[in-house]
Amino acid sequence: MSTPKSASFFTRKNILAFSFFIAFLVVVSVLVTVFFLDIKTGDVKTIINTINRTNWPWILLIVLGIVVTLAWNIIINWWVARRFCFHAPWWEWVLFACVVQFFQIVTPLSLGQDPFRLYWFIKKGMKKQTAVLLVTSTGAFWNLAQALITWPSFFVLSQNYALLEQNHEGFVSYWFSFAGMIFDVVVAILFIFIAYSKRMHVLIYSGVNQFRKWIKRPYLTKEQIYQRFIDKAEFNKLYGLEIKRLGLTIFKLLANILIAVVGYFSVFAVFAIVKKENATNNVIDQYSTADIFNITNIAITASNFIPVPSGEGATQFVMTSFLNAFKSAVGIESQVKQGVFLWRFLSVYIPAILFSLCFIGWVVQVVIEFKHPKPVLPTVNLINHHFWNNKKLHN
């Protein structure tokens, strides 16, 4: 049953306001990064001019990371959704994946992607409970994959704790990195707990409904919330069954690990791109590939918790601190600064600009559909569908 236009939160006015907010957020983020790192137009030209032309094919690794992530957002959502008789044109899946990628980039800790996925599936006709199951059963694997990659690197780094302890910045970075990784694990656990816990389900719904009541939007009564509490018991069973699909679960985990490894290793690719010929202070010459990889993925994870504005600032601070703690190399600060900025420029800023165009295209599509609503194909009623199958098996 479609929501009446008067009761819909996604009016043209609200969508346009949200779009301007996202655009403002992107502009502010870029300005904060530029001013904090003291990056000027001349600096950007210098970084571009320092690119080693013989190593430019390394850029393909960064492009591969973007393509793999985009393909993953299409494949996993399409694959899981089709089991519930959910269908959409191929171009809508591509647009959907681009907008998901956009929210991954512009929202803190990529927290905006899952609410968008939830809204998109429901808007396209998927039942709320089915959409929640789809989103929550895939959302925690990224944090889990990061933990499986980063913690071994952290243990390797900890073997050199004596060196880090002698270096004040390295010591500070070490413990902030530890806090950042703990935070990552907590987010993953909370994601699973929120999806599975009935009490948490009711608590969140109560909070959301209080907010909707405050802004004078339609909200659920206490009786309706408690009814959802009862429905949640059945949802828990289905969530458990979804996670127990070992083939799909292992595939989700391995795919996220691959995406994370390509993303972390792309920083090494950037240092290869900015490598100076006939110089002795190149990062990739001073440190082994394993050391750079371990320090890189710890630095990126630590950026969740380092109290430094902008992702570049945190990543640059941690990488420089750890590299200097391992081996004091003259001149690496400049190359780390150039490398981290170039990495973010190629893997974050350019994709953010491109995917923002897709986001604008999606907003236009939503406005058009709002003015000229189309009938949507219903998906399988998840609860009754599974219940009926189980009932037939027992009979």
UniProtKB/Swiss-Prot annotation:
Q: Where in the cell is it found?
A: Cell membrane
* Membrane spanning stretches: 15-35, 56-76, 86-106, 131-151, 175-195, 254-274, 298-318, 348-368
Q: Main localization of the protein?
A: membrane
Organism's domain of life?
A: Bacteria
Q: How does it sit in the membrane?
A: Multi-pass membrane protein
- UniProt key word Metal-binding: no
Annotated keywords: Cell membrane, Membrane, Transmembrane, Transmembrane helix
Q: Which InterPro entries match?
A: L-PG_synthase/AglD
Task: Give all cystine bridges in this chain.
Answer: none
GO CC, one annotated term: plasma membrane
Record's keyword annotation contains Transmembrane helix: yes
Q: Mind telling me what this protein is named?
A: Uncharacterized protein MG306 homolog
Q: Which organism is it from?
A: Mycoplasma pneumoniae (strain ATCC 29342 / M129 / Subtype 1) (Mycoplasmoides pneumoniae)
